[in-house]
Design a protein with these regions (language model features):
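Amphipathic, alpha-helical segments enriched in basic
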Residues: 40, 93, 102-107, 162, ...
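N-terminal segment of the mature soluble domain
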Residues: 47-139, 190, 196
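Bacterial N-terminal signal peptides
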Residues: 6-15
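Positively charged n-region of N-terminal signal peptides that target proteins for export
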Residues: 1-4
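N-terminal start-of-chain detector that recognizes signal peptides
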Residues: 11, 98-102, 156-162
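Short beta-strand segments enriched in small/hydrophobic residues
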Residues: 35-46
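C-terminal/domain-edge helix-coil "capping" segments
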Residues: 19-36, 136-138, 142-242
């Protein structure tokens, strides 16, 4: 009860969260007992602009689980990659150039196998893999994007030269519509029997600044100046643990 209350309070602090439509909670998933060991697996970002957020993401996953009453330890991602490569080779997935392709099924099988192996040696309740993903984010109310349980502000600027006092770089007041992109945390968890516990997502931020005057979009340079957005995204993604 105490651990669920702790996560519920964290969720209220982040605002109301609604699960993404493609989130999955396994039919056999049950909350681990208080004090259970949860093993964590960080998939490091390959996009340079996201790399600074990896440590923040892992730190938030650890701290929020500890607050909820669980013990945590971090697994070596290289061990998972070996299993992943084996599963991909067994599946025979290859690109047009003949190179091995690591698809979703290979990732799932590798994580399930890792969870079974880890449970035999550590008696862990879950293995949770965390990573950043870019997700579709519909624009709402002109200045916001809404996806994966949260609404986040768009960052819009107009850098075109102007004669008025506002000048270049002023914030544009205008209407945007359509589908944008949002940065989310993805959690994929398997229990000690190798069964899927859950796959969830939590919105972090709109990772791009739209420079309307120049007609281009680029990565924000202030994406990880603090960990507040990462913390909120993790609270949303950890909803099945409440």
């Amino acid at each position: 009860m105490r651990r669920r209350l702790a996560l519920s309070i964290l969720a209220l602090a982040a605002g109301a969260a609604h699960a993404a439509p493609d989130d999955i909670v396994g039919p056999a998933f049950r909350h681990p007992a208080e004090g259970a060991l949860v093993l964590l697996l960080l998939e490091k970002s390959t996009e340079p602009h996201l790399v600074p957020g990896d440590k923040l993401m892992l730190a938030q996953l650890k701290s929020q689980l500890v607050i909820a009453g669980y013990r945590t330890a971090v697994l070596d991602y290289a061990d998972y990659q070996l299993l992943e490569a084996d599963e991909a080779a067994g599946g025979g997935e290859r690109d047009p150039d003949g190179r091995l392709v690591v698809g979703l099924l290979a990732r799932q099988r590798a994580l399930a196998k890792l969870a079974r192996i880890a449970a035999e040696s550590s008696h862990c309740a879950l293995v949770i893999r965390t990573r950043f993903v870019i997700r579709p984010a519909p624009v709402v109310d002109n200045f916001f994007a809404q996806w994966d349980g949260a609404r986040r502000a768009l960052k819009l600027t107009d850098t075109a030269p102007r004669a008025n006092p506002d000048g270049p770089g002023r914030t544009v007041v205008g209407a945007l519509r359509g589908l944008g992109s949002g940065l989310s945390i993805e959690l994929m968890a398997y229990d000690g029997d190798g069964a899927l516990a859950f796959t969830t997502h939590g919105a972090v931020a709109v990772p791009y600044v739209t420079r309307l005057g120049e007609g281009r979009v680029e990565w924000r340079d202030d994406l990880f100046f603090g960990d507040g957005d990462v913390a909120d995204g993790m609270r949303i993604a950890l909803a099945p643990m409440r």
